[in-house]
């Protein structure tokens, strides 16, 4: 049974740039124990190939793949089950989440369900172009 002082680091990635940011963060903070969750779509084989090549290049050996369903209702249910699973595994631990998209509803819901956790947003820089055009 985990103790209250035990840390649990949960990292999310959906692109090779996220993996690079996670790797830099992990090295900077000297984090060896973590849970890496990949958000992937089955439809784009080239993107999947790039993710797996980046995982191999950076030395990530342990990770969980969360396949994103195309159906929005199934996606919602899958995300709820993931939150429940994380809730059970994280009881009595200090949590740190590396989230990948501040505009993502799932990432925001994590903040509601894990109020005492630390959240750090990693930025792959893609929204900069959208924000520049919009604002």
Model regions and ranges:
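Short, Lys/Arg-enriched, disordered terminal segments
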Residues: 1-8
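Active-site and donor-binding regions of nucleotide-sugar-utilizing enzymes
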Residues: 8-135
């Amino acid at each position: 049974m985990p103790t209250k002082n035990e840390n649990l680091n949960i990292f999310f990635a959906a692109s090779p740039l996220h993996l690079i940011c996670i790797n830099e963060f992990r090295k900077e903070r000297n984090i060896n124990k973590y849970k890496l969750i990949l958000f992937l779509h089955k439809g784009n084989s080239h993107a999947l190939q790039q993710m797996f090549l980046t995982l191999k290049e950076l030395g990530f050996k342990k990770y969980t793949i969360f396949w994103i369903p195309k159906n929005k209702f199934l996606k919602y249910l899958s995300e709820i089950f993931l939150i429940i699973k994380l809730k059970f595994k994280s009881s009595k631990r200090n949590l740190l989440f590396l989230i990948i998209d501040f505009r993502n509803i799932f990432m925001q819901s994590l903040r509601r369900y894990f109020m005492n956790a630390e959240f750090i947003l990693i930025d792959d820089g893609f929204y900069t172009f959208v924000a520049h055009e919009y604002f």
